[in-house]
Regions:
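Peripheral interaction segments used for macromolecular assembly
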Residues: 1-149
Length: 149
């Protein structure tokens, strides 16, 4: 599923015609997007392999930033699936295909730090945060948040 299919408020719908038969998109997307429309979005890698879908968006209430997208991978109908907290900066929006791209090999997710739905990690723990960002090659932003309080 993609963000346009989840758009119940018309955020991403074409707004008007330019007079020459071409549509002109107006509205906030894709620079600003509704959080609810992101949950359920597909995530692929650069080899066009399906990595799963976004199950949750984790907001840092101290900074107002999106910290992580929780990616679901594997399993069937929720059984055997593994969840991953992917740093938001590791995901890139592919507006052409209306999905997110994560630069990891599909088989590397088997060994990626993850969790199951009954045992969520403490995502505010600095050691956990450091390990997750190191795995995905992103820089934690929370050092800035802690020093600017």
């Amino acid at each position: 599923m993609n963000y346009e299919e989840r758009d119940t408020y018309g955020i991403y719908k074409p707004r008007k015609n330019d007079g020459a038969g071409s549509r002109v998109d107006k509205g906030p997307g894709p620079n600003l997007m509704g959080a609810d429309t992101l949950v359920g979005n597909d995530v692929y890698n650069q080899k066009d392999e399906d990595l799963g879908d976004i199950k949750e968006i984790m907001l840092d209430m101290r900074s107002g930033r999106i910290a992580y997208a929780v990616l679901s991978f594997g399993g069937f109908l929720g059984l055997g699936e593994k969840l991953f907290a992917v740093p938001w900066d590791a995901l890139k929006l592919d507006t052409e295909h209306k999905r997110f791209v994560l630069n990891v090999a599909k088989d590397s997710l088997d060994g990626a730090p993850g969790f199951d739905r009954s045992d969520w990690p403490d995502m505010a723990d600095p050691t956990w945060e450091k390990n997750i960002h190191a795995y995905y090659g992103t820089k934690p932003y929370t050092a800035d948040v802690r020093t600017h309080r």
